[in-house]
Amino acid sequence: MTDLPFVSALVQADLPVWKQCLQTEFLQKMENGTLSEDCFKSYLVEDSLYLREYAKIFAWGMTKATTMAAMRTYYSLLSFVQENEDLTRLRYLEQYGLREADIQSLPPRPENRAYLDCMIDAARNGEGEAECLMACLPCMLSYGWLFQKLLKRSPAVKDTYYGALVLDYASPGYDAACRAWAERAEAACTGLSPERAARCRTIFRACSEHELHFWEMCAAPRTDI
């Protein structure tokens, strides 16, 4: 993404945090095939609760977009992400006998709730589209980076129980969606005042750190499912 200077700088600045994510117990165990199904099931539940609120960040971004072209980008990319993620996630949930309708009545764990509150605050109270994108991009971009690295480092992971999830996020289609979102963010952040650009960097970093806390949280299973 060297042709996207603002987004590229954000990613480079936060790579140390993303590398910490890759070293978390949850992802290490997924990589070596020792992750318990209880932990994975809990991850799926937390991810489902997260995605419900995540979609709202896109909705705020759409309302703050200033052109029809930008609005269409939000719509098409959100549709891709939801369809791509939902298909695999729902299949896993079905294998565990979990219905999404039942999951939605559960409370997010504190680490997840703190992440959601951070994103919602940035999108709701930000000046415009840029803040919404800074809130949602760390999740999307870091997932692509993490699972590409994981698959490259341990190709055999694709043949494990978790392979479908890994392959989803390491796929060319997901990478293309990340690229499109990065381009949208670059356009939204071009010409920002130094003060607002600094706020956007702060939001991006905060959400990257929440990603780390989310992965750390997933090392222990929920006790209510």
Cite the ranges covered by each PLM segment.
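Basic/polar N-terminal segments that are highly enriched at the extreme N-terminus
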Residues: 1-8, 12, 223-225
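Hydrophobic alpha-helical segments
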Residues: 2-6, 119-120, 216, 220
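Alpha-helical bundle segments that constitute or directly flank the non-heme di-iron/ferroxidase center
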Residues: 15-20, 34-64, 84, 134-144, ...
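Active-site-proximal alpha-helical scaffolds that flank and shape metal-associated catalytic sites
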Residues: 69-176, 205, 209
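Acidic, carboxylate-rich catalytic segments that either coordinate divalent cations
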Residues: 199-225
